[in-house]
Regions:
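Tandem repeat scaffolds
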Residues: 1-206
Length: 206
């Protein structure tokens, strides 16, 4: 638990963070928690963060964290949940952060699972997400950039994919600021075998 921790300028290159509930008979939540942590200018390049819960919730949480100028290039963040799989950057400050080549994956394995990657109201101004892969897969899947600041963000060559078996698949940029954003060569897809599919730029600043 790194909630509220001061990790500004920390050298965490190639580090591994793992939270696991391994038995299918074991319920609960596997959480890696950086809520409101200060990671400004921290180096997490090449790091691996994995939360796994076969019968519970898997969460990697950076809600309201400060990641301005942080280096997460080539990092891998993965949440595998039996019920909910969530990677959350809601309201985080990622201005000028480097996430190039990173992989952010949420996978709901069993039951009525929900897979979510959340950047709601996050500040990603001037961030580099070029060549990154954001993939949410479950019975319901959402990639959420609602009201996010993506001014001057580099999403070139990136892949944003929401994939579901039965329920809704959504990639949501509602009211996001994408002024001068670079989406060249990017792929944004929402796929569902039976449910609704939505890619939403309603009221976004393009």
């Amino acid at each position: 638990d790194f909630t509220g921790a001061d990790l500004a300028n920390a050298d965490l290159r190639g580090s591994k963070f793992t939270a696991k509930i391994g038995s299918y008979d074991e319920e609960g939540e596997a959480t890696i928690d950086f809520t409101e942590a200060n990671l400004a200018h921290a180096d997490l390049s090449g790091s691996k963060l994995k939360a796994e819960a076969e019968r519970g919730n898997a969460v990697i949480d950076f809600t309201k964290a400060t990641l301005a100028h942080a280096d997460l290039s080539d990092s891998k963040l993965r949440a595998d949940g039996g019920w909910y799989a969530t990677i959350d950057f809601n309201e985080a400050n990622l201005a000028h952060a480097d996430l190039s080549g990173s992989e952010v994956t949420t996978d709901g394995k069993h039951g009525a699972t929900t897979a979510t990657i959340g950047f709601k109201k996050a500040n990603l101004a001037n961030a580099d997400l070029s060549g990154s892969e954001l993939e949410a897969e479950g019975m319901e899947a959402t990639i959420d950039f609602v009201e996010a600041n993506l001014a001057h963000v580099d999403l070139s060559g990136s892949v944003l994919s929401a994939d579901t078996a039965y329920n809704g698949a959504t990639v949501d940029f509602t009211e996001a600021n994408l002024a001068n954003a670079d989406l060249s060569g990017s792929w944004i897809t929402a796929e569902s075998r039976k449910g609704d599919t939505t890619i939403d730029f309603a009221k976004a600043n393009l």
